[in-house]
């Protein structure tokens, strides 16, 4: 909770020097603490950047590098990251804010020149990076003392809304002194370290100690909404300065999002095959599968295991051994069936006594099969005899094959067909002659009748 009520109106600024730039926070961050860490579907800070600026006017153009040559006195992080109220809201009465007097406090490599939208990706990320670098660089003087406030803070902010010359002179006087008392970043930034590579940023060296506790309090309030939603990691270390170049690990919500995704994947239903029982039987194999779902949302179904019994027939492949005896006849002394057929007498009334042998079927069924087979053979023989006699009779009626006793059946059929066609033609011819003769007979009968009348 903020100690000072801050208004979002352009002209309303808190008179406290520690909270002078607190009114800039609603421009970039919502009041909700869990905006970026509300859930796995929340968008990163860089994707909804245009939604943050839809209520703000068009930002002023970045100043040219020509004004940097006139800078004689370097400024600290506040002049690089923040603008005055008149610059932010575009006061038409102060169009010369970016004059030599207003930009005299910028460093040779300000952050605002590298990002014309002030914080194109994330304003808080750059603010935290700049503050951590300032604090790490401030460990070299290592001067500790009580917190002091500059009495001209309110006057400087009030003068910034007046004339441009006064604003350009008062703002560097207030913010030109870097931090004298440094704060450990592990205490201020209670956020998990991101997996992204750090970005090197050059920061101007500190010259005069001042306002360390005030700066630390402002940064702590800026990082408070995010640290309330995410727990602090057990170990958070910062890298020492190396040749004036400082690398700071930026914080983000990637770790929190990945943890939530892993928890959702663990909650999904998993089906494990608990037991697989394979029992080999004669001509078949039985597989027993026990399926147990793992999900707390299923309730009573989780305790009840489902057993699926899949039973399928496995064919038995055996290689035929031609030298082995027949599996259907156990008695080796029993003669094959061909010998039985040969022993059948051509006479239909003669009975044949089959040799006694062991078989899988009963004796009654064997006798019935033999009787049926014998009757079938007799009927087949009679049919063949009748067919042979029919061909012989047909051959005798064909004049060309009367004397040919060895004529084939095909020849007999062919010659018989030709002879039938010949007989049909002859019959038709005889019928025509008969009709002519009948007509001639009628004429002769009429002549006889006329002769008898005269």
From Swiss-Prot:
UniProt protein name? N-myc 2 proto-oncogene protein
- Key word DNA-binding present in the record? yes
Biased-composition ranges, Basic and acidic residues, are 363-374
MF GO annotations: DNA binding; DNA-binding transcription factor activity; protein dimerization activity
Question: Which residues are in coiled coils?
Answer: none
Domain of life, per the record? Eukaryota
Cite the residue spans of the region called Disordered: 133-166, 231-270, 326-374
Q: Which InterPro entries match?
A: bHLH_dom, HLH_DNA-bd_sf, Myc_transcription_factors, Tscrpt_reg_Myc, Tscrpt_reg_Myc_N
Q: Which UniProt keywords apply?
A: DNA-binding, Nucleus, Proto-oncogene
Where in the cell does this protein reside?
Nucleus
CDD domains in UniProt: bHLHzip_N-Myc_like (cd11456)
Report the residue ranges that make up the bHLH domain in this protein.
Answer: 371-423
Q: PANTHER family, from UniProt? A: MYC PROTO-ONCOGENE
Quaternary structure? Efficient DNA binding requires dimerization with another bHLH protein.
Q: Where is the composition biased (Acidic residues)?
A: 256-270
GO cellular component terms, alphabetically, are: nucleus
Q: Report the source organism.
A: Otospermophilus beecheyi (California ground squirrel)
Residue numbers spanned by region Leucine-zipper: 423-444
